[in-house]
């Protein structure tokens, strides 16, 4: 099979998926395409029902959820330089994203929803739709503080017992808030406030005065 033939087949499959999504969601469809990938935007109140339709509709059949993750858009659009600023995101601060795979039809889809409340981000759990997202949702809760309504065991899964905060949030301090050390008097590991002093390191470059001359 030539490279051109393969690319044509992929584009044809992508167009078929677009048409099937249009037929399934009608006027509610919010679809974007970039780099040969499709992203479906879903309102938070339709999150569970839309994902259920993606799994059960014979024309879609996304029977496998490859990944679920949280995203914090707090600094989205700021850029590393002032001239790179593109403006803040127009939706909420927190999003939940799933990557789906249809083994039957051999196509993929990214689906994203936005938590409506930045202070208490919450969306419906997809555990009844794809049981494999159990620990994915616990991870997003642990790292971002996103609550998945209906999850039967929404506990932290990566951070330590008694951890305060959510370390993947953009406003969480890079050095953390506490550190661990062994206390010889208590003969156990204890927590204490972070003792790292924040500092900015500027590299120093030293060159000879004639560096680069005559080249």
UniProtKB/Swiss-Prot annotation:
- Record keywords, A-Z: Cell inner membrane, Cell membrane, Membrane, NAD, Quinone, Translocase, Transport, Ubiquinone
Q: Reply yes or no: does the keyword Transmembrane helix apply.
A: no
The UniProt entry, under Pfam families, shows: Complex1_30kDa
User: Domain of life of the organism in this record?
Assistant: Bacteria
EC annotation from Swiss-Prot or TrEMBL: 7.1.1.-
Locations listed in the record: Cell inner membrane
The entry lists its GO molecular-function terms as: NADH dehydrogenase (ubiquinone) activity; NADH:ubiquinone reductase (non-electrogenic) activity; quinone binding
Family affiliation: Belongs to the complex I 30 kDa subunit family.
PANTHER family associated with the record: NADH DEHYDROGENASE [UBIQUINONE] IRON-SULFUR PROTEIN 3, MITOCHONDRIAL, NADH DEHYDROGENASE UBIQUINONE IRON-SULFUR PROTEIN 3
Subunit architecture: NDH-1 is composed of 14 different subunits. Subunits NuoB, C, D, E, F, and G constitute the peripheral sector of the complex.
Tell me the HAMAP family matching this sequence: NDH1_NuoC
Protein name in the entry: NADH-quinone oxidoreductase subunit C
Query: What species does this protein belong to?
Result: Bordetella parapertussis (strain 12822 / ATCC BAA-587 / NCTC 13253)
Q: What is the lineage of its organism?
A: Bacteria, Pseudomonadati, Pseudomonadota, Betaproteobacteria, Burkholderiales
């Amino acid at each position: 099979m030539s490279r051109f033939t393969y690319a044509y087949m992929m584009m044809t499959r992508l167009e078929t998926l677009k048409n099937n999504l249009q037929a399934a969601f009608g006027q509610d469809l919010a679809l974007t395409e970039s780099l040969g990938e499709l992203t479906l935007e879903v309102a938070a109140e339709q999150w569970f029902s839309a994902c259920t339709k993606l799994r059960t509709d014979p024309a879609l059949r996304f029977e496998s959820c490859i990944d679920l993750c949280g995203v914090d858009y707090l600094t989205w659009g700021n850029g590393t330089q002032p001239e790179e600023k593109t403006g803040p995101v127009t939706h909420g601060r927190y999003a939940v994203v799933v990557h789906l795979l249809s083994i039957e039809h051999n196509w993929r889809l990214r689906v994203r929803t936005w938590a409506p409340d930045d202070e208490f981000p919450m969306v419906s759990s997809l555990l009844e739709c794809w049981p494999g997202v159990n620990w994915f949702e616990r991870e997003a809760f642990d790292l971002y503080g996103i609550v998945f309504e209906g999850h039967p065991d929404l506990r932290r899964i990566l951070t330590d017992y008694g951890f305060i905060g959510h370390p993947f949030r953009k406003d969480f301090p890079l050095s953390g808030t506490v550190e661990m050390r062994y206390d010889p008097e208590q003969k156990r590991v204890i927590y204490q406030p972070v003792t790292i002093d924040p500092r900015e390191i500027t590299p120093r470059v030293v060159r000879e005065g004639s560096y680069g001359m005559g080249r």
